[in-house]
A protein has these predicted regions:
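Long, charge-dense
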Residues: 80-94, 102, 151-167
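Active-site loop-helix segments enriched in His/Asp/Glu that coordinate
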Residues: 121-161
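N-terminal metal-binding scaffold of metallo-dependent hydrolase/deaminase domains
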Residues: 1-47, 168-205, 215-225
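Active-site mouth loops of central-metabolism enzymes
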Residues: 95-111
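Phosphate/adenylate-binding glycine loop and adjacent helical scaffold
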Residues: 114
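Hydrophobic/aromatic ligand-binding patch that stacks against planar heteroaromatic rings
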Residues: 118, 142, 186
Length: 225
């Protein structure tokens, strides 16, 4: 179904003329898993009569790239909501992870699935792995089922010993162009993220925890309450 995603500000993060800067009252048209138009809402809507319209607050950007998925999924434990009273809601790592003892594969599998969902809630649509594939079968299965794009690690930042990678891709300190997996382009895969902030500066300051929607290959896979 043809869908228009509209927002007060669209940040295409592209280099093509007309897509190299912010678009006020912008929109992205999506048909299936592909982007069919990017521009002002009026222009996009004119070219897509009858399309369903989803209006979002804040800024709409390309989906983000997470450089450290394996660390986050296999070296952090993501508590089940039923464990929140005992373990809290944030990922456990280091000494707190060790205190859990040996976890069964079933429990690890649940943690990995929840970790993937947490990435989606941070606007992530692509994850990096050496050779663009995961050798850990639990991680590989969870990522494949989610629909996340797997990319290579060329250009990935290093992680200091003892430093915990963050679910927020902006924690690496890059600007938007350096944090997204690729720009919004007509004909490209419809991987989008929406953040409830007024502009790119606020997005970099407040981070991906402000995400209110994630679209993966045209599918709305996360919507904040």
């Amino acid at each position: 179904m043809l869908t228009i995603h509209a927002a007060p500000l669209v940040l295409p993060a592209g280099a093509d003329p007309g897509l190299d800067g912010p678009v006020v009252d912008g929109a992205v048209a999506v048909d299936g898993d592909r982007i069919t138009a990017v521009g002002s809402y009026d222009e996009v809507a004119e070219g897509a009569p009858g399309a369903r319209v989803r209006r979002w607050p804040g800024v709409l950007t390309p989906g983000l790239r997470q450089w450290h998925p394996l660390w986050l999924l296999r070296h952090c434990y993501h508590p089940d909501p039923r464990e929140a009273d005992e373990l809290g809601e944030q990922p456990l790592w280091g000494e707190r992870l060790a205190a859990l003892g040996d976890l069964t594969e079933t429990r690890w599998s649940g943690s990995v699935r929840r970790g993937v969902q947490r990435m989606l809630r941070h606007g992530t649509t692509a994850v990096a792995a050496p050779g663009a594939r995961f050798r850990d079968p639990v991680v590989a299965t969870a990522v494949a089922r989610s629909g996340l794009t797997v990319v290579g690690t060329t250009g990935a930042p290093g992680t200091l010993l003892g430093e915990r990678p963050d679910l927020d891709p902006f924690a690496e300190g890059y600007d938007l162009a350096g944090t997204v997996n690729g720009p919004l382009t007509v004909g490209g895969r419809a991987d989008l993220a929406v953040f409830d902030v007024p502009d790119e500066s606020a997005l970099r300051e407040r981070g991906a925890a402000t995400c209110v929607a994630t679209v993966l290959a045209g599918r709305l896979v996360y919507r904040g309450r």
